[in-house]
């Protein structure tokens, strides 16, 4: 056990506890073109007999009937306060309650994201240059059994160095750290532990872990992409490996239509390989100036890639 343990006591009618480990409340903000207003779509899953769910956002409460274990409603939000990265990471809070007394709540942010081959990452309609680091949830003497103290220290280090983004490598991290990313405005890349070597017998495991990653973390405004794998061709490439990535890619799009997919390729993989272009965004782990070569070789590599694939979004 390397995460906090909670004992949950709920009435017979309660928000679903077995929906892939998610809180039972999903929130999807849809902003207007001018970013001034938004429709906030809320969905809740219920176990047991419940007639309705009361959703509360600010001073407004909407009641929605429960049909086949699910209730949903839409709020109209005026004068939207954007979640704007490290500049202004504003969070809204929504609560859902049942007549039985059970309640859940979730933070969310209103923001738009896009990726452009020329302008890079676009946050709320403007280019937003991403500079940061990959973070492992690990400490000497603790392994990955980190407490809030260590999570806070890692976030403080990222902020001290001026980072505005973090890749959460290479597995699902603690909810507390995703919350910190939301709070402090760090743009996050979240991914599953599918690394270096493809194991055909592990397909069900990868699909299960991706489902849990997306469903559990859907509400976090800091997360802008889902990572399919890391340097997965390090031990070779097979048709089954490619097929598994197609399944993962399709699964992400099915579970979440609001975020793109990505994967980090090992630097030995040919930049014209079809696998490079399977996810929505491609990325490379280049080691020039670290393991091999000189730092300025990174510039030459990306210039060549962009010349050959001018419409492809690429990250380092």
Feature annotation, model-predicted:
Residues 135, 171-173, 193-195, 229-231, ...:
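Active-site beta-loop-alpha junctions enriched in small/polar residues
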Residues 274-275, 287-316:
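Glycoside hydrolase catalytic-domain groove-lining segments
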Residues 220, 255-256, 273-276:
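Acidic-histidine catalytic/liganding microenvironments
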Residues 177-178, 268-278:
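Distinct, well-ordered alpha-helical segments
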Residues 142-146, 172, 197-204, 236-240, ...:
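Alpha-helix capping and helix-loop boundary segments enriched in small/acidic/polar residues
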Residues 279-287:
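Structural signature of the urease/amidohydrolase superfamily beta/alpha-barrel
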Residues 1-180, 184-188, 209-212, 222-228, ...:
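Secreted/periplasmic carbohydrate-active enzymes, especially glycoside hydrolases
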Residues 199-203, 229-256:
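Active-site cleft segment of glycoside hydrolase catalytic domains centered on the general acid/base Glu
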């Amino acid at each position: 056990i390397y995460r906090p343990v909670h004992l949950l006591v709920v009435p017979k009618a309660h928000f679903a506890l077995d929906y892939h480990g998610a809180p039972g409340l999903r929130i999807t903000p849809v902003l207007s073109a001018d970013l001034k207003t938004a429709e906030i779509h809320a969905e809740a899953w219920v176990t047991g007999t419940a007639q309705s769910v009361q959703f509360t956002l600010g001073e407004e409460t909407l009641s929605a009937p429960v049909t086949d274990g699910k209730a949903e409603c839409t709020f109209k939000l005026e004068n939207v306060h954007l979640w704007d990265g490290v500049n202004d990471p504003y969070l809204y809070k929504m609560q859902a309650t049942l007549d039985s007394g059970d309640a859940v709540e979730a933070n969310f942010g209103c923001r738009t994201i896009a990726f452009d081959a020329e302008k890079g990452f676009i946050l709320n309609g403007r280019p937003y240059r991403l500079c940061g680091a990959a973070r492992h949830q690990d400490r000497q003497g603790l392994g990955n059994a980190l407490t809030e103290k260590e999570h806070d220290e890692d976030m403080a280090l990222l902020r001290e160095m001026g980072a505005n983004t973090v890749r959460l490598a290479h597995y699902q991290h603690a909810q507390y750290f995703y919350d910190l990313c939301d709070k402090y405005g760090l743009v996050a890349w979240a991914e599953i532990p599918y690394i270096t070597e493809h194991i055909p017998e592990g397909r069900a495991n990868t699909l299960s872990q991706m489902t849990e990653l997306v469903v559990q973390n859907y509400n976090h405004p800091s997360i802008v992409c889902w990572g399919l794998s890391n340097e997965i061709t390090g031990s070779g490439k097979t048709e089954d490996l490619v097929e598994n990535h197609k399944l993962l890619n399709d699964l992400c799009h099915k579970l979440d239509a609001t975020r793109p997919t990505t994967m980090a390729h090992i630097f030995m993989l040919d930049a014209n390989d079809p696998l490079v272009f399977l996810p929505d965004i491609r990325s490379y782990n280049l080691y020039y100036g670290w393991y091999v070569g000189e730092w300025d070789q990174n510039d030459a590599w990306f210039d060549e890639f962009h010349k050959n694939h001018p419409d492809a979004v690429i990250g380092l």
